[in-house]
């Protein structure tokens, strides 16, 4: 009779699950320290202030957390989407109350097409951002005065490293470009906004299933964004 111990097939899987949990916990720990941990952003935003200002600081932090979770965890440069940044209950960084903002995550190695139709906005602009060191910089900005529209107000705008032949509206993607922000200005909230859509021009493989490494990387990016909120 063999009484020796033999590893069962499930044990390598269990070990990998424990390793995955550890990596996830590390990512969550970074986020916890950035938000509510002692000495984190929550303390930096509220320390030394009266109770009302402290409460506003923590409310600001919750808004940043909700927004950055959507931007850093859910948005994907391989499946681009324009997400509304501000709303009546999500406002931060001294936004303009007469402006409608949308955001998309980009990959500078890919090509994108924005298409849509003008509404009743007074101003329409597309702004590219990227990190130079630790500073988020404006890399390019194109507004309606720089663009061509058809008689019905429809337009196409291509974002790419090189300008394609025959394209009327184009913005160059710098190799550090990571974010697109659109702005529409209004004088009346009843004015109709522009219709905006974004799509990927390159054919790429379907997105893989989520991995612990990928989610952990996004959680750490989320932590870094939140940690810079008070700077």
What kind of region is each of these model predictions?
Residues 5, 10-230:
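A compositional/structural signature for long, glycine/proline-rich flexible linkers
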């Amino acid at each position: 009779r063999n009484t020796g111990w033999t590893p069962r097939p499930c044990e390598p899987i269990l070990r990998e699950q424990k390793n995955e949990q550890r990596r996830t916990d590390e990512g969550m720990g970074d986020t916890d320290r950035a938000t509510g941990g002692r000495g984190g952003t929550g303390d930096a935003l509220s320390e030394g202030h009266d109770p009302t200002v402290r409460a506003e600081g923590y409310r600001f932090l919750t808004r940043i957390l909700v927004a950055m979770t959507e931007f850093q965890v859910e948005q994907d440069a391989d499946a681009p989407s324009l997400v509304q940044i501000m709303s009546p209950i999500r406002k931060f960084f001294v936004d303009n109350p007469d402006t409608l903002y949308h955001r998309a995550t980009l990959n500078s190695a890919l090509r994108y097409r924005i298409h849509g139709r003008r509404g009743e906005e007074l101003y329409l602009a597309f702004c590219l951002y990227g990190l130079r060191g630790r500073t988020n910089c404006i890399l390019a900005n194109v507004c309606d005065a720089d663009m061509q529209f058809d008689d019905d107000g429809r337009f196409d705008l291509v974002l790419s490293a090189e300008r394609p032949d025959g394209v009327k509206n184009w913005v160059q993607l710098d190799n550090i470009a990571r974010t697109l922000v659109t702005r529409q200005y209004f004088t009346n909230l009843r004015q109709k906004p522009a219709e905006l859509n974004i799509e990927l021009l390159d054919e790429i493989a379907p997105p893989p299933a989520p991995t612990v490494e990928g989610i952990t990387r996004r959680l750490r990016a989320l932590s870094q964004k939140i940690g810079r909120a008070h700077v």
